[in-house]
């Protein structure tokens, strides 16, 4: 049975700091894993670092729960593909699925098990800065491509070693920004 501290720790998902400027206290992150104060990371890059953190989570904690390691794998990981808005112009769901599959293989090889993609906001104001992450203003096209992204990232049953979890984002009506404001 999990303690309250362990349950709260599982809800904590800090940035690992690899994709930010400035100093990152790796010793503090390691201590947080050992003390079961986190359930995962995002923005951690590098298989060695991720494997070391996973080993601590599994071997040095009471419950041995693996960490969720997430990243914004929006249009590729090591191989960079066109942005989602550009991909949507093709109406080619198979190409989108292949892109997501390649991205999943590359990200999972680096220890990533979760992506914050696809973005399914229906965007109607081209001034909004996040419009490039989505499929534009057509709900039908957006639904077809979202399905293709998820199939590509997750495969058929999430049993393969090269599959990653897909987290469809954002919130209802987040894409209905006014005057291009990101609120």
What are these regions, as identified by a protein language model?
Residues 1-183:
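Glycoside hydrolase catalytic-domain context in secreted enzymes
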């Amino acid at each position: 049975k999990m303690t309250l501290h362990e349950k709260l720790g599982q809800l904590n998902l800090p940035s690992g700091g690899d994709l930010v400027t400035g100093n990152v206290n790796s010793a503090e992150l390691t201590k947080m894993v050992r003390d079961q104060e986190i359930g995962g990371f995002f923005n951690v890059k590098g298989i060695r670092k991720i494997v070391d953190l996973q080993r601590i989570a599994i071997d040095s904690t009471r419950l041995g729960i693996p960490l969720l390691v997430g990243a914004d794998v929006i249009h590729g990981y090591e191989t960079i593909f066109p942005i989602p808005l550009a991909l949507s112009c093709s109406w080619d769901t198979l190409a989108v699925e292949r892109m997501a599959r390649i991205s999943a293989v590359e990200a999972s090889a680096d220890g990533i098990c979760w992506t914050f993609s696809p973005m399914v906001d229906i965007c109607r104001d081209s001034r909004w800065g996040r419009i490039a992450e989505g499929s534009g203003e057509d709900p039908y096209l957006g639904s077809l491509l979202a399905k293709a992204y998820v199939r590509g990232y997750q495969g058929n049953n999430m049993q393969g070693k090269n599959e990653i979890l897909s987290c469809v984002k954002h919130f209802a009506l987040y894409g209905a920004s006014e005057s291009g404001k990101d609120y």
